[in-house]
Regions:
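Short alpha-helical scaffolding segments that buttress acidic/His motifs in well-ordered protein cores
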Residues: 84, 98-102, 148, 152, ...
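Helix-turn-helix
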Residues: 11, 15, 19-53, 57
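C-terminal peripheral helix-coil segments that are non-catalytic and often amphipathic
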Residues: 86, 90, 120, 124-132, ...
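Hydrophobic alpha-helical connector segments
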Residues: 68-96, 141-148
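Amphipathic alpha-helical linker/stalk segments
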Residues: 22, 56-83, 122
Length: 196
């Protein structure tokens, strides 16, 4: 059973997600978050200590949830990319939070301090798949990972061309998933063949 403190924390995180996704870190207001969550500002501060720590908690919640919802496997890069596409549709706030963090805090370099080991495990899996001939060995594992994530986010909220929404027709989503899988297969998988 969820405790009252856990429910309170989640109400604050949900309201903060909406505020930060819409307005960024600098534009977000603690009073709006408190009002939207139905909590007082002192309650918000007692749980998170301030706006910056609250953003960090919101960001971590969405990034970690994405990793939990879409477990990585180097055995099926095309399928992983398609599952990421679906997850970005299900959690449009994720891409917006990533964008705001990149714009307002970490303009360059690694965006996920504290999660280095998480990504290092993915890079080891990619390197092992390269060694076994399933992923192109002429690319650095870091580059494979970056290209995979960026390609999967082609239609996410940070797209510079077209943003996909859950309201788009199912046939359009199917077409995009197929194109994404083909592009990843041809560009990252050894011999352009389906892995797995």
């Amino acid at each position: 059973m969820t405790s009252t403190a856990d429910r309170t924390r989640q109400l604050i995180l949900d309201a903060a997600t909406e505020e930060f996704a819409a307005r960024g870190i600098a534009g977000a207001r603690v009073d709006r978050i408190a009002q939207a969550s139905g909590m007082s500002k002192p309650m918000l501060y007692s749980h998170f200590g301030g706006k910056d720590r609250l953003f960090d908690a919101v960001f971590a919640e969405h990034v970690i949830a994405n990793g939990d919802r879409v477990p990585f496997t180097a055995d099926d890069l095309p399928g992983y990319a398609a599952r990421l596409y679906d997850d970005y549709l299900a959690d449009p706030a994720l891409a917006r939070l990533v964008m705001w963090k990149r714009l307002e805090r970490d303009g360059t370099g690694y965006l996920y301090p504290g999660l280095e080991e998480h990504d290092a495990a993915h890079l080891r899996d990619i390197a092992a798949a390269q060694a076994s001939g399933r992923i192109r060995a002429d690319l650095n594992p870091d580059d494979v990972w970056t290209l995979l994530i960026a390609t999967a986010a082609s239609w996410a909220q940070v797209s510079i061309t077209t943003v996909a929404t859950r309201d788009d027709p199912a046939a359009l989503h199917a077409r995009r998933r197929a194109a994404l899988e083909e592009h990843v297969r041809d560009g990252l998988c050894a011999g352009g063949a389906t892995t797995g």
